[in-house]
Amino acid sequence: MKNLIQFRVASIILISIIVSQNSLADQRPNVMVILCDDLGYGDLECYGHPAIKTPTLNRLAADGIRFTDCYSAAPVCSPSRVGLLTGRSPNRAGVYDWIPNADKPVSNKRHLVHMREKEKTIASFLQGAGYATCLVGKWHCNSEFNRPQQPQPDTFGFEHWFATQNNASPSHRNPNNFVRNGSDAGAIEGFSCQVVADEAIHWLEQKEKDKPFFLYVAFHEPHEPVASPAEIVAEYLDDARTEDEAQYFANVANMDLAVGRIMKSLTRLNLDENTLIIFTSDNGPETLNRYRSANRSYGQPGPLRGMKLHTTEAGFRVAGIINWKNHLPQSMIGTVNQTTISSLDLLPTICELAHLSLPKEMHLDGTSITSLLQGNLLAREKPLIWIYYNAINEARVAMRHERWKVLAKLDGGSLPKLTNVTKDSLPLIQQAKLTDIEIYDLKNDTSERQNIAKVNRELTIELTERLQREYQNLVMDSHAW
């Protein structure tokens, strides 16, 4: 009798543990990260564009939080994407510039660049915790795409992937370079953002119903070569100065429609109640006619200085919208938030919300913003730092610390531009001196017009010392090929 009672007690305890674990799993959020490509800070209606209509994103912002000071991990695509997925500066991962397709060896070893297998991503952690995981859209984290020489999306936790190495080709219209789980998808009719939305919706319909999910939607729009549906272009001909500009306006609008279709599918599948949605861009807008296929790149930086490939604000300050139905505090719904956040924050935030502990030895550059999503202030102890050795402007180094923006040249601007760091060039960047310090008060000078470095000497000394520490910390941990 005593043994029977002990058995029953043990059974009750075991059942309680299982129920508790299942309840915990049920409470974990689904996560959808939506990433645009070269979207300007001023390209959305809710960020002030005078012509482009983005009703879906307007609603996401109205029912969520719109951030004014959201940053990408880099002012260019590949390093930005690596930073978003890993929560680490792309310099630590050894991705310094956009990654070309590895057609032949080049002297600076750029053909070798890829996100190395040792890197752990959001998808890696979530897949290990029982999440269903999916990538649809642009990958751009390796040079040997869909080849055995380098790791592919499934190596980094994506159990289903439908992607391109870089841009949709030959344009957004009827792309023919998508790969689905290692097999060429062939020619596809339609426009890239809608093709990506189709795949995302189909995956949501087919995935295991009892698993939470992580869906990474990486649109190609509005990166060149821009192509948009004629009927949407026609809607913007009166607002645009040229047909090419109308093409760009329609490109952003078509992306908004694609987001709307995915949102409707979440509602139809009863997945909207506990899905955290994060919308942002990989970097700022492309400069019109910087090269031939940028003839339709009419992206707007809004009030910010510079464009893509710059270390001034427009290079990496981007749209940032977070929506989490029934989970954000009511006081935050529909607010415009001035807290500094970064795409580097996604991994620690999402993992915390999924009740995952990260390895102590993992050197993260992002900060969990979970407390912010709960209605509290965010204490960001570590400043944001960018080192882009191929920047169009001469300041290769930038830092955001509290309200302050710091820019610096390397060796007075004499350090050669670099698209990759090799064992030969690594000593150059490690020994380089930060010079020509500029400081801007972004609270009062969003456009970076008034350099106060020579006005406030005490502040300049403090921020310069901080920048030097952060620079050395990063370059000493930067990977060389």
Regions found by a protein language model. Name each.
Residues 9-19:
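Bacterial N-terminal signal peptides
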Residues 1-11:
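Bacterial N-terminal signal peptides that target proteins for export
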Residues 21-438, 446-481:
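Formylglycine-dependent sulfatase
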